[in-house]
C-alpha cells in the first residue's frame, strides 16, 4: 500500500524527498503496461493529471501522485490542454489545445484502451470540458468557426463509444473553460471573446471588437440564465479560466489583449445573481505579470484561491470569503496548479518542474525536474 503523508509531516517529508528527486527524470510506465490498480493504493491517495510535451517532441498525459512521482503516461496525437474528471474519479477526458480536433477518454484505473473523440466537421475544441453530475454526459466547448460562435457539444458516454447527442450555444465567441455549478444544475462558461479560425491557427481576428463574458446556462436545456459582460473600456480582457470557492462564487482569470502599457486587474469574481467584480493586485506585482493569468483553482475547502501567472513567474493567492489578495510566491513559468489539501498545492511549470507550495506562506519546494519536458498549462486533481 502506498505510504501516505500526514499533513503535519508533509513539508518535512517533501523537503527530504526534493533533495533526492530534484533533477531526476523518472521513466514512468505507460498505461499499456498495466493499469493503476486501485487496490494497490490507499483509497484516500490523491492523483493528478497533466498534459506534457516530452523530450522527444511527442505529447502525452501523465498521471502523478501527491509527491510529484509520475506513475503512468498516455500518448496523445498532438498537444493537450485541459482535463475533465468524472464524478466517480474513474474517467478522464483530455482535450486538444485550440484549434485541435481530438479529445481522449482515459480510464487509468482499469487499463482499458483510451478512446478517441473527434470534433465534427466545421468545429474544433477549445481545450476544456466538464461532466454532468451523474457522469453520463460530457460538455465540450467548441468553435463553430465558419459562423464564428461558441458552442457546447454534448456527448453521451454511457455506450461503448462517445456519441454526440446535441449542442448548446454559449452566447459568445471563443468559449474557453466550462464548469458545472456546485448544485449540478448550471453550466458556467467563460467566453474569452476572441474570434479565431483554424486556417490561421493562432491568429486573433477581432481584438478591436472583443466582447468577453461569463454566462450561466441551464444544464438541462441550454437556456441562458445570466450573462455578465465586462466593462466596455476593458473589453480586451479575455476571460479564460475559472474555479468556484466554498460558497459557489466563480473566480475568473483574464488575459489582456490590449496595449502593453496598460495593466488592468486580471482576476474577477461573479455569481449567477452577482455582477462581475475586478480585484486589484498590488502595483509592484501587477507590473511584472505581463497581463496574463494561466490557471485558477481553489484549495480543498474552497477558502483560498490560487491564480498562476506563468509569464510573470508568480502564483497569486486570495482569501475567498473577503476576496482580498493575500500574497504571492515565485515559480518561473509555473502555470498548472492543483490543490493537495486545505493549504497546499502541486504546481507544474514549463521547464519540467513539479513543486509543492504551502499557499502564500511557504517557499516552494521543487519535487522533481525532468530535463526536456514541458508541462502544459493545467494540473488537474483526479
Stretches with model-predicted labels:
Residues 2-20:
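N-terminal secretory signal peptides and thylakoid transit peptides that target proteins
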Residues 74-105, 110-131:
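Blade-loop segments of beta-propeller domains
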Residues 152-157, 208-219, 265-272:
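Beta-propeller blade signature
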Residues 141-144, 189-209, 253-264:
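Short, conserved, GDST-rich strand-edge loop motifs in beta-rich repeat architectures
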Residues 79-85, 124-130, 173-177, 236-241, ...:
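Repeated scaffold domains used in trafficking and secretory/extracellular systems
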